[in-house]
Amino acid sequence: MKLFILIILSICLALVNSQQGVYPDSGVYVSLNSNFLATFGNEFTQTIQNQINSYPVANVDGKTGKVSYSVTNIQQSVQLGDFFFQQTGVNTYNIGWNSVTFTITTDYQGCYKIGGLKKLSICEKGDIKINSQATLSLSIAMTIDFTQSTPTISCSSTTLNVPANGINYNVHCSSKVCDKTHDITNEIASKFVPSVESGMTTEINNNVGKYLSLFPSLRDMNMEYNGNEFYLDSRGTIVESSQGGVLTPTMVLAMNGGIVVKNSAGQFIYPTQSPSSLPSEEAVEDFQTDIAVTLTPYLFESLVDAMFESALPMTITPSEVPSESPVHLNTSDPFFNQTAPGLTGKYPNSPIDVEIISPSSSSQTMVSINSTGVLVGLHSIPVNFIVNDETVFQILFNFNIELTPALSQSSNGISVTGTLDKLDALVTVGSTSVGDIDVSGFVQLIELAQGLVKIPTITIQNPLTTYSLSDLSLSIGDQYIQILGNLQQQQQQQQKQKQILIK
């Protein structure tokens, strides 16, 4: 029984916090196709059935009323079919099988005392057979919540649906004295179903803690910068698709999808913005591959802001500029002599420190996705030019960036990067104490540096760790990027590779 419960839990973890057909704004949607889930359900059912039927059940000793009993040599044969799952409400769902048949056989011995002083023991022994006479169904009601940093899972009830006369209880006594056969039969008949239901519920709740770590609230993106680590906020909900009439509907894991920074002090810094776009229902539900991963602008917006959080403020000193650079941080450098002549006149031949400051929260990164690619808008990035510890002028940079996304497969998931197609810069003067500033020089400088821009890579970990991804493709829709692929159990894949090598 315990093994049966543990295996059930493994599938329960993939079906959390359902709310049929209602999708929240998120950064990442991971959709599993109905056909894949049906195949998975069949394989899962066969695995459970084999495990149950081969599981050695320990002997049971106990006492009921005046009868002490011993149940030995327990054998079971269970057949499961029509695996299903369904959303029943916010954070609640049912999982089970619409077809359950079984046969259980045991040997038993029951002993009781008789006589005036109860000193004479009478023992009866024989065998018990419990079997289904009709098709039963098993339904497990779960409450699972992964919306917070600490997930919770619990089983509220287990129901074995039995039609009238659906189970036959047969106790056969092989002793010469068989006074308690009728009592034993009635006892089993009255307690079998309730004990199965309560036992499964208890075992599930006793073991759910082992599986909470399979759905972490933060997933490591294997990215580090400037002593900071990057994580994907994977809190969210699983939504049952709007399609009806199937036992295993397409399921969509809607994750927050924001990029969280863990700084060198161990503090976690979450995005200041929230998801604000929602793909169409068709985008996350209607696909032919096993899995679809849909990325929205929020993921990329929070990534850029996370990079700002990690890198800024940043100060560049004259000694950090390479000797071969076309511009040097000195007030008498030709570049500054042309763009800020008042600076050269007021502070001749003086070193310049450049301080780049993170944009204010009111100047959030804006990302848009359409058929041409990914458009990134970075607004009002302040850059201070400092001479003798005094800010002599400030420049505000606004960037419009066009990217073409590119897809690659990593060892632990999917990696998305991009190629820079276009970088437009709008430069304005924030403040100055050295007269006019010719901002066109800074625009030209940005154009020269365009080839040095590196686009960070986003890695989305494969949420199904026992499956590998194949046949990956990328497409762009209205405010989303979608990655399609198929899933294969790693053990099966290894067997196929071995067969190819043998041939």
UniProtKB/Swiss-Prot annotation:
The keyword Signal applies. Keywords: Glycoprotein, Secreted, Signal. GO terms for molecular function: lipid binding. GO terms for biological process: defense response to Gram-negative bacterium. Residues 1-18 form the signal peptide. The keyword Signal applies. It is found in: Secreted. Disulfide bonds: none annotated. Transmembrane segments: none annotated. GO terms for cellular component: extracellular region. Glycans are attached at N330, N337, N370. It holds the Pfam family LBP_BPI_CETP_C. Belongs to the UPF0522 family. This is UPF0522 protein C.
